[in-house]
Amino acid sequence: MSQKTLFTKSALAVAVALISTQAWSAGFQLNEFSSSGLGRAYSGEGAIADDAGNVSRNPALITMFDRPTFSAGAVYIDPDVNISGTSPSGRSLKADNIAPTAWVPNMHFVAPINDQFGWGASITSNYGLATEFNDTYAGGSVGGTTDLETMNLNLSGAYRLNNAWSFGLGFNAVYARAKIERFAGDLGQLVAGQIMQSPAGKTPQGQALAATANGIDSNTKIAHLNGNQWGFGWNAGILYELDKNNRYALTYRSEVKIDFKGNYSSDLNRVFNNYGLPIPTATGGATQSGYLTLNLPEMWEVSGYNRVDPQWAIHYSLAYTSWSQFQQLKATSTSGDTLFQKHEGFKDAYRIALGTTYYYDDNWTFRTGIAFDDSPVPAQNRSISIPDQDRFWLSAGTTYAFNKDASVDVGVSYMHGQSVKINEGPYQFESEGKAWLFGTNFNYAF
């Protein structure tokens, strides 16, 4: 793995940082901002106003609340992502459960000011990723640990123009933190083989270098990078109410620019830097700085909610994320030298969701939904630290209202990903993944 590849992974770590777990939407985007939404596969989120969590998706929904309302909870993600393959060295590349479980918290508050104005605040996350491989894993030079966390702080306001139109605007502050570690695995053996097959392998110097490379332990830390940074953006929404039973929404979330600063080190001997070998830049354990600017892509979403019967409603969404804005990653040193410049070539991607809600009585509400997440990652750019794939959702949930003020939401989703092939460095992998998500939120209206 080259230093270029290392910083590629670290950049994705920052991008993915908007939540502290394996990303369970396409790319490294996340949706898990409420448990009621989880139960309907996040369908119609820009137009539904059944709890304060919806306001983080569409600030215009603030005008639908006539009392200060609070919601807090978490979604537990239990992924099952497995990797298989065989290294050119003959060692197995099999690794099970590479994505750890995690809790994803959320908190929301909405307060009307009068009949026309209101404000809201939330703590959520919109991107995230985590993968972990054993320190002695054969493909450790491209696996290792990728631990990415973020937190999104949102403050928003809304204005009701008339009975039909409402508008909302929000400000987002995103805190991102990343830790990347890569280990030698069998890379030393592969490098030694390359040297011995080249003309250098016929020289005493080349043979000595090959012997040194072959002696690198599998758990040698060949790359380490960590860092944190703030980024800022905005979001907006429009809500159109045809009548009290039918409403439609258009929402927008801007790019977030994160100027990531990381500390890079490698335990490899600096002698390897003199031979142009396919390994990270060696620092002999010393630390140096690297800088990378990453733009998290903008997102558009159209949503609808139709209460077709006193007890039944349908809701739906189509989200479009401009992943084509993510075309390259470029890292520089403190002196401004380019450490790498890599073409990523992501494509724009969409998410489509459909759900229904059954209002059983004043206490019980039931919901369900399905969704499809289109992956923005081209097949040739997949990696085992971000084994992205198209995903299909099946979701169900319920709300129990204790009284007119307090209620609790419970949601569950099953996500199934396609089996994909990954070519990364000298390795060829196959990856398959699925996940269960469980969420609960408590809601209170003052």
From Swiss-Prot:
Pfam families recorded: Toluene_X
Record-linked SUPFAM superfamilies: Porins
Main location: membrane
Keyword Acyltransferase: no
Any GO molecular function: long-chain fatty acid transporting porin activity
InterPro entries per UniProt: OMPP1/FadL/TodX
Subcellular localization: Cell outer membrane
Leader peptide range in chain numbering: 1-25
Gene Ontology cellular-component annotations: cell outer membrane
Presence of keyword Hydrolase: no
Membrane topology, as annotated: Multi-pass membrane protein
Keywords, alphabetical: Cell outer membrane, Lipid transport, Membrane, Signal, Transmembrane, Transmembrane beta strand, Transport
Similarity field: Belongs to the OmpP1/FadL family.
General function of this protein: Involved in translocation of long-chain fatty acids across the outer membrane. FadL may form a specific channel.
Protein name, entry field: Long-chain fatty acid transport protein
